[in-house]
């Protein structure tokens, strides 16, 4: 059950209504997480959507971005984002079994993605500055400085929705995912 106010889409007005209309046109529905964010802080919803649009134009592929989304959402314990992003990861080319691997912080048959999910899980779980060795290992896997910054951008975007959903206990409106 939601802990934060979430207006029904039909009752939204102003910026929230416009954002909800745009989201519905793009994805066919307004996910509960977006209803909650838009009901309480439409400017933040707009910013989050804009950030994700910018990241969609980055040098990171959809496959890489969805690997980050799954690894970070598992690390932070966000069941909602795992349910939302698992089908997107499948659409980006992962099998169901691979989505489970990504959530556990590895990918057996792709060294680059394996390095990516290990890096982002370390980034989210470690306290303080990452060691030069960790950053060098990520670069050695083929990631540029620009891609490191873009990776941090994807982590930032998914952590925002992870935190909203963990505080709100947002009702999941996607197919449930397997526990690991």
Show where each model-derived region lies:
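Hydrophobic alpha-helical segments
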Residues: 1-180
